[in-house]
Amino acid sequence: YSSVMLSDTAGIDKDEVCIRLEQATDTAGLKKEGFTISTRGNMTTVTGNDGNGVIYGCRELIDHVGQYKDLKFPAQLTDAPEMVLRGGCVGIQKMEYLPGRGVYEYPYTPESFPWFYDKEQWIKYLDMLVENRMNSLYLWNGHPFASLVKLEEYPFAVEVDEETFKKNEEMFSFLTAEADKRGIFVIQMFYNILLSKPFAEHYGLKTQDRNRPITPLISDYTRKSVAAFIEKYPNVGLLVCLGEAMDTYEDDVEWFTKTIIPGVKDGLKALGRTDEPPILLRAHDTDCKMVMDAALPLYKNLYTMHKYNGESLTTYEPRGPWSKIHSDLSALGSIHISNVHILANLEPWRWGSPDFVQKAVNAMHNVHGANALHLYPQASYWDWPYTADKLPDGKREYQLDRDWIWYKTWGRYAWNCHRDRSSEVEYWDKQLGDYYGTTSAEAGDILEAYEQSGEIAPKLLRRFGITEGNRQTLLLGMFMSQLVNPYKYTIYPGFYESCGPEGEKLIEYVEKEWKKQPHVGELPLDIVAQVVEHGDKAVAAIDKAAAAVTRNKEEFGRLQNDMHCYREFAYAFNLKVKAAQRVLNYQWGKDLNELDAAIPLMEQSLDHYRKLVALTDSTYYYANSMQTAQRRIPIGGDGGKNKTWKEMLVHYENELANFKANLQLLKDRAAGKVTESAAEIKPLSAANVKILNGLTPVKLATGANLFSNVPGKVDALAAELEGLTAYRMNGDVQRKEGTTIEFEAAAPVNLLVGYFRDDQKKYAKAPKLETDASANDYGQAEPKLTNAVRIAGMPLANVHAYHFEAGKHTLLLPKGYTMVLGFTDAQVTPRNAGLAGAEETMDWMFY
């Protein structure tokens, strides 16, 4: 090809194709980013409604050449995107905490993020966005300001050395300039309230503390940071997350309206700008509508964002309370962004179902009222830019290379989700055929494998999961205890009501069977049967395609292995669910034969899990890319442990051994070989601590008064708690200020805190990892004793344990009534204290 001036086109040979690019001068009634292509003879004219429209018109011609291998461009074609923003996100975060730092605290440095300074890699990513007609790039980080701007009032707040600071300036300028050339809007995300580490240390503060109040110092520092960022990087937008280190919704409103928006305005004023660039507000861990109602009178150009299926991909039929959040925000009339977030249930295997994605994007429009897309990587978000794959030569595979179909599907349907299904099958057959060097017909088997396997993880999580969040890594499996008593593990509220069709949990299904009650919606045994069928079909299709592959053979081998992984996982899960059904049958009918029948099912499940171990041991470094204490299901992921199937196999084998031993115990009891005796529960030993902030001690016993402002006394409490030194609190003060405990311990201790089981605003919220990433910093995420304290006129309470090493400590608890039950130097054995009444659950059979 060659470039010619428009004045010279008369001399073009009739056999040559001339492409003319122009931008519309009269844009009245034209859609943003749209284009028109018209061909007359050998002249094809691309007219963009704006600069982006010209770019996307050119992409249309490139796609035509790739699809049809000719230059016979359309006589007339007009197109424009359905979604206003269409973008991908990159996390400037890591799989583990940096030494001495908390969650999300990652300064921009070459040591932590060498890839961030790789310009060639950024060009490749930006070009990928353009290829898929995406127009936005989101950078996620806890507190980016201390890596990118300097404040005259707080010069010590910068978290990087001078050389790195200059590199960061240069990279940000480069990235925004290259993005701008491609019509891409760069948006920096940040959490609140996070402080720079040197700033926090200078003033004796924590970098983040969910339960501290907003102070003038913290507000001033953040306001000035935002202003300096806006002034220095005027073409970079801000995505504001009002969690996960803010206490109340009222604090969120105050922070956004009195710190963030004024900071943006200060930056604009310094530039002499009177326009309002968009500020994006996440509806995560906040009441977004409440914030928007307060903020819109102050700043008009506000966009909203909410997670599509939470932190997983579970359905293209969303409903319930989480869908209402979307529709309420959409009704405000601003741009509403659907966030395809984390994808915890898809890690780490390949996923790329065009049919699922097209239906999901339709749901974003029709159910949620969204008109923009924010897209996470398909897997390994925390390990960007690498995948979890182990390559034979020890090198790492890049996500952009492996997961090209992920970005292509979401980009294609964010542009237009109303495409004809039969034409789409032809399109994807051609795409896959070109990539793997097969005919379109042969590539149809690869598409079939993607679409069959694409149903497995979504269906299983929405019907059996504890949460859609980072807290659970589905594809490592689940314990029997989690299947027979999911409530013990704190099912995330709203998950089952929002992230799939109406249906039943296994525990509900069995109860209805025994009570002869009608079933409703999607049923657990149907789902496990379906995923087995999906797995069989995916493997049959991918194996059938194998002989035809002539290109990217190694990558095809990895895709083929993933399909086999999905199949073995589906088989293992199916058999485990059937075993759990038998155990639940025993709970209702007390027939020991039901427990006997569970054993071969568990053994067969393990056989398939061992095959899964064999398929993954040499092919994957890990399943989950978030490798911290936040990962709790199926088991804690503290310190990067329990992240492979090989590690999990040992736990699942122990689970079966425990079950067999406990079953034998039941049989011995039934045969009269064991005499029943109530296990003696001894009180916990009190730890010797020195209280530094004047709390009022009270001996913990029946009749004790734990609140100075309410008459109710302790009616009953778990035997473990008898005799501990608790502390009398004022509930009204707790509601207004939260609870502070300052103490000194000579040896490691556990502080026991009681949270009331009630969602009224007056009661402090128990730790919840879905909305507070620091909720397990002290090992407090799960209750140690459930139904353990009863006070007259108040709800039952669960007891959580906060572990501290020797030394001086200050703990802030959330606002609301909560009980400080004392310190112990003993380990607390988890159990249901049963003050709610006798409720036998079957999870004990597996311990």
Predicted regions span which residues?
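A short beta-strand element within beta-rich, extracytoplasmic domains
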Residues: A747-D759
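C-terminal non-catalytic alpha-helical accessory regions
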Residues: G102-V103, P377, Y398-T644, H651, ...
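Contiguous ligand/interfacial binding patches
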Residues: A764-T829
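Catalytic-core regions of glycoside hydrolase
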Residues: Y68, S112-W115, N135, K166-E169, ...
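Extracellular and analogous surface-interaction loops
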Residues: N730-V733, E737-N750, H800-H809
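Glycan-recognition and processing domains
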Residues: A678-R735, A838-Y847
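Acidic, contiguous N-terminal accessory segments
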Residues: Y1-G41, P74, N705-K713
